[in-house]
Amino acid sequence: DDALALAYAIAHPNLELIGVTSTYGNVTVPLAVRNTLALLELLSNDNIPVFAGPSPDGFRPSDISAFIHGHNGVGEVLLPPATTQAQPQPAAEFLIQAVHEQGDDLVIIPTGPSTTIAAAMQQDPSFAANSHLVMMGGALTVPGNVTPWSEANISQDPEATDYLFQHTHDTTMVGLDVTLRTLLTTAESGRWRATGTHAGRIFADMVEYYIRAYATTSPH
């Protein structure tokens, strides 16, 4: 789903993607960075900079993450190694700089744990006051997907998410209440495959792996 978010953001005519920060969750940060660089190159947008975020010591993805997303995080699809590298600047520093430079034109869209966002808020209090966030995570009126009380992104670093909510001035939470109503089927992936492009096939393969996994875990 994060790979699709990248693709849709790049394709949207009214959006300019100025950078991507990679975090842990379904995979480790180094693997997330490699995947992001490879996907941007696949989408002919390898000029977009990628920044590595922080990660807890000894982090290992869960077995259920590997089952749903594949051990490589992209449905076991083999992506050609990217020819570019991540930026040396830490992700939190990039976000702080971007908010100062872009102002109200910038919207940050976290789709993983809140660790990087909380780090930026702690490093620069003005980041919390001036950033606009639309985050994927949480569950308000429905059960969680890790435990009945916990959603996957929030559960990775609940302390960071608590810090975010305590200090943010403008955050929209898009939780399971919304995302569970958003359906993607093999009809859509079939249309991508039918384009005959390399990117279309890659994204169809990724999504169909995801669909098969959820057909097992959530057959309803």
Regions found by a protein language model. Give the residues of each.
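N-terminal acidic, glycine/proline-rich low-complexity segments
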Residues: 1-220
